[in-house]
Amino acid sequence: MGHFYRFKRGDQVIIVSGIYAGFPGAVDGAVFQRTIDYPDAFSPGYHVIISDGPVVTVRWDQVSAMNIGLEDNQ
């Protein structure tokens, strides 16, 4: 895994930008593919399961740690 991937499966995150900004969710996995907000470019990112919602693909810089115990700026 590269330095872009700071979260692992099950980590609680909040989406900080894009269509789903402000939505909490859980990381399902790290991916390298097109995302919902950047469909024309392949990027490192995550599949995030939105609480009571869909699974979305977001870039690595569109999520932030929800738990205080996780380092957000590594």
Identify the residue ranges that each predicted region occupies.
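Intrinsically disordered, low-complexity, charged/polar segments
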Residues: P44-Q74
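Short acidic, glycine-rich loop/turn motifs
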Residues: I15-I19, I50-D52
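Mixed-charge, Lys/Arg-rich low-complexity intrinsically disordered regions
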Residues: M1-V16, R34, D72-N73
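Short beta-strand-centered aromatic/proline hotspots
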Residues: G22-I36
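Polybasic, low-complexity nucleic-acid-binding and compaction segments
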Residues: M1, D37-F42
